[in-house]
Amino acid sequence: MRVVYKAPGEKPEVREISGELESLQDLVEGWIERVGIKKGLALVINEEGKMHRMEPNFYLSKINDLIVGPAVFVGEAGEDFTDISDSDLEMVMLHFTEV
């Protein structure tokens, strides 16, 4: 599954992962939490990132909150995570060109 991975203080990078729960948990370093961005696009973060005082990553105005720890942008189809679309991939990459 094609995703965009964004670590704190780093530029985003496109990655290919298995799409299994464990692969997402490995990337976010713990239990996952889904944050809806828009139809067909979601953000997967560490559910306990703030509790574990993970490093700040970026501010997400849609939910008026600071995202901490590693974040993974994924596509969505219903309740399933999918490859991020070409247009969403481009949008995410452009948004995070500056670290």
Question: Each PLM stretch: what is its role?
Answer:
Residues 1-99:
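Domain-length accessory/inserted modules outside core catalytic folds
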